[in-house]
């Protein structure tokens, strides 16, 4: 148990301590992002979560202001439009009344803020209206002599006016046309109780304007209740890349909403364009993250169906205003959910992907992704690990040269939406894993491969007479091939070479399982590699190009190694190469990200670079 814990701890240290060197680059266009987001919306329950009742209080705080920038500044003399915060404030003086507000007929708003009621009994006589109430009223006649003139003080009424129009019998006095008992203000008059504009009249309190006033349908959002989103169509997604920032996301959808109003049930259909500015960042763990900076909803094509009654146009306006307030709080969270799914997809890149039964491949981000006007570029460091062991470092042993830096990628084609570039270093790491696991080592015996000539001392003796002299009776041979150093991968324009330096030990199998070595040969081979894709894997197929032999040791004396070139080449072509291709047959896993499909990708071999375009 202690040993297992130590191995696990060392593996973690190895992963954390590995330098972030780019050996794989992925480029995607905005279309890939759009398709990925559309697919996630279709598969997830993000839309279903929005089908709910609008909670009370939603709409008082715009999503894109209070959730991002904080509350707006407070204006001391600014009044709220119909009691709901809007972007624009109404700048008013302190002594102005509000349309449909608190003030009723017969009331005066004093300069200090109090309300004076002119309808009580104390104002029904001329005496109270002018002289008798002089001590309480704010207006008074200016005392002045016959031959003297002076300036009027604030609040004074000229004497002629005070005793004329405002006096008893005057226009505004008791009994006058405009007095409390007159045609306009008297009981039953135009402005009186029960009159056209009076309290209880058609346009007064309780009438049409009462509906519009304090507590009326237009004073608060509560004029519409029971709002519930009942249907949300699958959004049409569009993405615009913002160089150096991230993306500008747009979700166009149709929303069906039910609700109630004072004049009937509402069926609301509205077209909504949810727009969000999204910044691409990288968190502390090294994963890229898409984060909303701002979210807005643009409404259009609002249709309201209701039992037609009073003021349908005013109800339409109210619906427009209410939806503009409440929909951001309900629909912008959908963007949060979708981006969370995209971030989860980006995190899947870091998961271990099996490389057959021998090891695994892990793609990690080596730097902050690059956003241009044409594509999003993800720099990846691909780690190849042994099954239950450590990571494969490239190069390891031979060839003892430093890995080349990641070459510059070619421009993306007009019809290319995804581009994956893999360096020769990464492909070499995959072959190194096979070498370390001894997957390339092979023992070949007589009769194992029908295509080969008989592997006996008689066959070898025909080439090397000293073998026939030493083994006059035919004995079976064993050809033991070992790859002691990691293979190397060389990528050139339209050509990929895999170099394998192996040893071939020729042994005689004798009775009682005795094995005697005849010679040890260094075999320097070159294979032409071809690439294809199958599902989410890169397939590699090798074909023998040439072999070069060098005699290292011999127990039958020196001989011309060139005599064995034909036989050894056949052994590597008909036995070693199929065995190596069988091991490579499991394929190299490609990064699983954003639902990119490379199954029909075009593959180009460039200098030190393998490029897949889909």
From Swiss-Prot:
InterPro entries: Bactericidal_perm-incr_a/b_dom, BPI_fold-BPI/LBP, Lipid-bd_serum_glycop_C, Lipid-bd_serum_glycop_N
Record's keyword annotation contains NAD: no
Expression (tissue specificity): Expressed in nasal tissue.
Disulfide bonds: 295-332
A cellular-component GO term for this protein: cytosol
Listed SMART domains: BPI1, BPI2
Record localization: Secreted; Cytoplasm
Glycosylation site residues: 273
Keywords: Cytoplasm, Disulfide bond, Glycoprotein, Secreted, Signal
Gene3D superfamilies assigned: Bactericidal permeability-increasing protein, domain 1 (3.15.10.10), Bactericidal permeability-increasing protein, domain 2 (3.15.20.10)
Main location group: secreted
Role this protein plays: May have the capacity to recognize and bind specific classes of odorants. May act as a carrier molecule, transporting odorants across the mucus layer to access receptor sites. May serve as a primary defense mechanism by recognizing and removing potentially harmful odorants or pathogenic microorganisms from the mucosa or clearing excess odorant from mucus to enable new odorant stimuli to be received.
Family of the protein in this entry: Belongs to the BPI/LBP/Plunc superfamily. BPI/LBP family.
Protein name: BPI fold-containing family B member 4
Name of the encoding gene: BPIFB4
